[in-house]
From Swiss-Prot:
This is Phosphatidylinositol transfer protein alpha isoform. GO terms for cellular component: cytoplasm; cytosol; membrane; myelin sheath; nucleus. The modification N6-acetyllysine is found at K216. Phosphorylated by PKC in a calcium and phosphatidylserine-dependent manner. The gene is Pitpna. Pfam families: IP_trans. Its main location: cytoplasm. A 1,2-diacyl-sn-glycero-3-phospho-(1D-myo-inositol) binds at T59, K61, E86, N90, T97, K195. Keywords: Acetylation, Cytoplasm, Lipid transport, Lipid-binding, Nucleus, Transport. It comes from Mus musculus. One of its GO terms (biological process) is axonogenesis. The keyword Cytoplasm applies. It is found in: Cytoplasm; Nucleus.
């Protein structure tokens, strides 16, 4: 049994802008989660092309997670089992990410399939699932300006879209009705990231607990990440994809150094 949910994240940026903003924010957020032997290690970051014509950027990363999983898993899992591998195929505006664990092999899987569409999250079944499968998928809307969707320990005033105003674009702050107002603002673009998340965790006695925990953490991650992405708008809105590739090279070097020298930091599990 696997647990499927679709998270819909609406943003006041265009689909083209988001391509740069997402990659910039992934690089920055990785630094905030890396230190004390934990965090992100980038193994591969290179273009790919498949036989069917799909092409884009392929990345393979290892996440060293010791303090970022619940205590009940830490107590049961042997040393080294808390590293997960993330392989991503970014054929923007479609992206596919597969997360696995060498210790659990085929008993553990997180798959995130994302379509980026120029709408307000109104499309049903953008991932073209079979009707019977789609019937069982829960659609969850993430509002980046809703303070109640953010854990108090994750909240940062400088990463609050309800307070941020972009100097370069004039966008923000986002009020309680910002999504409805977007429709009438002809000068402000918008888009939705439709994130279909499949979670499989086969471990007798823990399956439901861990699958629900993973979905809770994915929602938390998507919420915090997209709040940051919008509040960092002025840092990335003028960048090109060439700028991003140069930045990713530098970030890889920094992450290797930070993992060895910095203290543990970033998001930890809610036990």
């Amino acid at each position: 049994m696997v647990l499927l949910k679709e998270y819909r994240v609406i943003l006041p940026v265009s689909v083209d802008e988001y391509q740069v903003g997402q990659l910039y924010s992934v690089a920055e957020a990785s630094k905030n989660e890396t230190g004390g032997g934990e965090g992100v290690e980038v193994l591969v970051n290179e273009p790919y092309e498949k036989d069917d014509g799909e092409k884009g950027q392929y990345t393979h990363k290892i996440y060293h997670l010791q303090s970022k999983v619940p205590t009940f898993v830490r107590m049961l899992a042997p040393e080294g089992a808390l590293n997960i591998h993330e392989k991503a195929w970014n054929a923007y505006p479609y992206c596919r990410t597969v997360i696995t664990n060498e210790y659990m092999k085929e008993d553990f899987l997180i798959k995130i399939e994302t379509w980026h569409k120029p709408d307000l999250g109104t499309q049903e079944n953008v991932h073209k699932l079979e009707p019977e499968a789609w019937k069982h998928v829960e659609a969850i809307y993430i509002d980046i300006a809703d303070r109640s969707q953010v854990l108090s320990k994750d909240y940062k005033a400088e990463e609050d879209p309800a307070k941020f105003k972009s100097v370069k674009t004039g966008r923000g702050p986002l009020g309680p009705n910002w999504k409805q107002e977007l429709v009438n603002q002809k000068d402000c673009p918008y888009m939705c990231a439709y994130k279909l998340v499949t979670v499989k965790f086969k471990w007798w006695g823990l399956q439901n607990k861990v699958e629900n925990f993973i979905h809770k953490q994915e929602k938390r991650l998507f919420t915090n990440f997209h709040r940051q992405l919008f509040c960092w708008l002025d840092k990335w809105v003028d960048l090109t994809m060439d700028d991003i590739r140069r930045m990713e090279e530098e970030t890889k070097r920094q992450l290797d150094e930070m993992r060895q020298k910095d203290p543990v930091k970033g998001m930890t599990a809610d036990d």
